[in-house]
A protein has these predicted regions:
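Domain-level recognition of soluble alpha/beta enzyme cores
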Residues: 143-167
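Generic beta-sheet signal
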Residues: 122-132
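Short amphipathic alpha-helical segments
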Residues: 14-15, 59-63, 139-142
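Phosphate-coordination/substrate-recognition cap region in phosphate-metabolizing enzymes
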Residues: 33-94
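General small-molecule cofactor/ligand-binding pocket signal
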Residues: 1, 71-73, 165
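Loop-to-helix element that buttresses phosphate recognition and phosphoryl-transfer chemistry
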Residues: 1-56, 99-111
Length: 168
């Protein structure tokens, strides 16, 4: 199961976050607590998260509520958005040139992380807390619609025969 982190002030302000280490805001912490309550019946075996504060904090709130330790993996990070980082969406509307991490490299990195998690936890229920762009890359890899994914959006999926597949 993959989930996008809960809300930050930069989400609320519609700012590009990328690798910026922006913490959750109060609403984000409340969202993470609600997510934990919703996932209580899932009997998770493990929780893995991006090392960026917004994903790590989301995972830690869920983990503390469910009694599951969080393992951090930097390969689950959001795409590096280059010079867009910290700027609002409207500020970059007329900046067509992308100077961040290539989408292909981001997809490779996130797939590598998910594959490693699946190999460490065969036949187990794992929650992976990551970012909207990371979830988008996985959807694109499968030829699915690439979002957008709101904060705390959960995507039920499984790793089978060396590949990720959606469950819903």
């Amino acid at each position: 199961m993959l989930v996008r982190h809960s809300e930050t002030d930069w989400n609320a302000e519609r700012r590009w976050q990328g690798h910026a280490d922006v913490p959750l805001n109060d609403r984000g912490r409340e969202q993470a607590q609600r997510l934990a309550e919703e996932l209580a019946a899932e009997k998770l075996d493990a929780i893995c998260a991006s090392d960026l504060a917004r994903a790590r904090e989301t995972a830690e709130i869920v983990g503390a509520t469910l009694g599951v330790e969080v393992v951090v993996d930097p390969d689950l990070r959001e795409i590096d958005v280059g010079s867009r980082q910290g700027r609002t969406w409207s500020e970059v509307d007329d900046q067509p040139e992308w100077d961040g991490e290539p989408h292909e490299a981001h997809a490779e990195r996130v797939l590598r992380a998910v594959r490693a998690i699946a190999e460490r936890h065969p036949s187990q229920r794992v929650l992976v807390v990551t970012h909207g762009g990371s979830m988008r890359r996985l959807h694109e890899h499968l030829g699915l619609d690439g979002g957008p994914f709101g904060n705390c959006t959960v995507w039920a999926c499984a790793w089978e025969n060396g590949s990720i597949r959606p469950l819903d």
